[in-house]
Amino acid sequence: MNRILLTLLAFSGLYLASCNSATPPPVTVQDIPFSGGEGTSLPSLSSDGTQLLLSWVSTPTDSTAQFQFARLGEDGTWSSPEQIAEGSNWFVNWADYPALVQNKGSLLAYHLQKSSPGKFSYDILLHALPKGETNWRGGLPLHRDSTQTEHGFVSAAAYTDSTFLVSWLDGRNTGGGGHDSHDAHSGAMSIRAAEVSLQGQVIWDTQLDAKTCDCCQTSTAITSQGAVVVYRNRSDREIRDIAITRLLDGAWTEPSIIHADGWEIAGCPVNGPKVVAQGNTLLVGWFTAAKGAVKVQFSFSSDAGANFGAPITVEGQGIIGRVEVALLDEQSGIAAWMETNKAGTFLMAARIESGGKMGKRWEIGAMDSGRKSGFPQLEVLGDRVYFAWTEVKGETNQVRTVFLPKAAF
């Protein structure tokens, strides 16, 4: 073979190698057009491993609220909105919002409805759509007391094949004193749980803790050993750290603190925890400002919540919190939180591992730092990680949904 031919072959090989090693296009956050339009807020994402649902509240007028949802299709777009309920006497709050959960094709949703003209009196109403049915069974009571007090901050999860496990903050012992009442005649906010059928009927309910923080979200998950509920506790010394209680062999354990932050604060920070489960793995995220150190923390448990590892921490005065978590497998997950820097306020997300490692921090999207933006949402389905939040556009709001490939984390 002559030298010219050898030279040509060599250059051809180099050319092909350079083509094969071309830099792939950059990974970017991808928008999913929202089907609900403007005047929408308070999104909630729900995945059962096969289907992703998005719920939200639409306010066509100042006095009317519509609870709606959509399904993510195989083509990656949202379906037309379907209505769950509508009302003019609802309690609609930026931190205490309606949501829905799935159980093998059956749906359970909930919203808050005022029980009196008072500011701090509202009830939790359930809406059930059993698999195969087309009409929602609505307006079903969750709690069995008739006190005109606060009931809210609901969380729920599929429990058995035929039931859901629901937890909530319950003000029946407060006497209607409002948030953080120190009136001598007012009792404390408590947390309760109930098992609810696919038809929306309460099977049993019980008190989990007689004294909790008044207005931080609860969070519920199901491990291989049973249900867990995570919430912000409140001690007699006003220490408000994150607690967990577990349903084991038919009995709830005494609440225990996940990590002793020692956050002493006289009022509610309106910044609750989030928990997710897979097998015996738990991942919990929460906000704290103990001793003036503002941070979000994330901790894994490998024994269904009996013990937790050292927290993975993101610290800084710009940390807002409003955490979200999702598991990728039994050793890793996605953590999300809100954070303000010199460029603005953003929803941030990163991969975290049970060994303590945190990966690249992704800037998912710009957010309003105030209450209007609500609490961002996170779910993993298939090879994508989905996010939702309320985008503030001047005087109006609109739900925004985006995704990143799971491989980006």
Place the predicted regions along the sequence by residue.
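Sec-dependent N-terminal signal peptides
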Residues: 4-14
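C-terminal motif of bacterial Sec signal peptides marking the signal peptidase cleavage site
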Residues: 16-18
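Extracellular, repeat-based ectodomains that mediate carbohydrate processing or recognition
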Residues: 20-409
